[in-house]
Amino acid sequence: MSFDLIIKNGTVILENEARVVDIAVKGGKIAAIGQDLGDAKEVMDASGLVVSPGMVDAHTHISEPGRSHWEGYETGTRAAAKGGITTMIEMPLNQLPATVDRASIELKFDAAKGKLTIDAAQLGGLVSYNIDRLHELDEVGVVGFKCFVATCGDRGIDNDFRDVNDWQFFKGAQKLGELGQPVLVHCENALICDALGEEAKREGRVTAHDYVASRPVFTEVEAIRRVLYLAKVAGCRLHVCHISSPEGVEEVTRARQEGQDVTCESCPHYFVLDTDQFEEIGTLAKCSPPIRDLENQKGMWEKLFNGEIDCLVSDHSPCPPEMKAGNIMEAWGGIAGLQNCMDVMFDEAVQKRGMSLPMFGKLMATNAADIFGLQQKGRIAPGKDADFVFIQPNSSYVLTNDDLEYRHKVSPYVGRTIGARITKTILRGDVIYDIEQGFPVAPKGQFILKHQQ
């Protein structure tokens, strides 16, 4: 058989091993894995490179339509491709209107036409005002539903995202359980975090350490414990977003051991930044839950290596620079991190701490694809989409603002020396990013809908 593409001599991350092997691609799919596979129209030599499944980033905010001056499909997905992401799962908030019904998700699809460099799946929102319309989003094909039990949204904008109270969460989870959809939750105690934050501002405590103190670990743990129980009673699968503390992970592990259907994610910034660095970097490193101290970070690494965290995600949530101005308590909370998930974590987890390549592949791609039912994604295996990222190990560079593809070229990682490089990203058999050529093809990404899987 003649193939469209053969990738030769790379160290390939397979599901349970990594070895030097060739990959054949035909019609955008992985056709064969082995040696001496035959002829191809194109042959790529990946000698000295790690060939990983393209990252499946299960937590991104693109903000289009309505807030494309924050981030947009064109810039956001180019940054993703440059960072080795081939599939993103987009959150239902930051854009206007929030993605909470059929009409709003159709606006998303229209806004993305001709702009997607990578593939995308979409989450719907569970908010205080759409519990009777959740089925609309399920019918369109979302792969899950996001909600906040922490305070969110601009009360001055009618169609912005809104948090839910316990009753609304429970009723929504019941409906989502009936639909067979997971609920994804931002877990922080709204009343306590809001009160502590207001108290700090009144008293003039506005440093990074003050911000972290206003959102203590127990507020995350309490919220995780609460939604675990409510989701269990409601009969709904639960995914806990961006866990920042080992104590929070322990709640998920305990529930899982008791038989509950629950998964969780965390983000690179909780593993590579700490509160002292947050103080130095400033508002660009503000997020919630917040970046915590070194002892907390050490515990998170232990949980990651123990297999208690299912996947790593960017939680890419940028905004215009003026919203990051002023003191840390007042600035927008969100990190621009889409472009540097894979290289930073390959350096920190694999090269510096000895994580196995198969575990890295699961954390960056396989597990997220499985959690959200993306059956063609997340694995290098025959029949799957030919989505790959080439990683050059032990190749250090210093990240600059000019390296970034975001609408606003800022990131808390600027100035960081990163010890690995993404050299090529391939989506369904086509090179969508190359370190020398840039972006050689027109945007070819498409939306992945649940009912098409």
From Swiss-Prot:
Its EC number is 3.5.2.5. Belongs to the metallo-dependent hydrolases superfamily. Allantoinase family. It is an enzyme of class 3 (hydrolase). GO terms for cellular component: cytoplasm. Binds 2 Zn(2+) ions per subunit. Carboxylation allows a single lysine to coordinate two zinc ions. This is Allantoinase. Keywords: Hydrolase, Metal-binding, Purine metabolism, Zinc. Pathway: Nitrogen metabolism; (S)-allantoin degradation; allantoate from (S)-allantoin: step 1/1. PANTHER family: ALLANTOINASE. It comes from Escherichia coli (strain 55989 / EAEC). InterPro entries: Allantoinase, Allantoinase_bact, Amidohydro-rel, DHOase/Allantoinase_Hydrolase, Metal-dep_hydrolase_composite, Metal_Hydrolase. The modification N6-carboxylysine is found at K146. GO terms for biological process: allantoin catabolic process; purine nucleobase catabolic process. Zn(2+) 2 binds at K146, H186, H242. It catalyses: (S)-allantoin + H2O = allantoate + H(+). Its cofactor is Zn(2+).
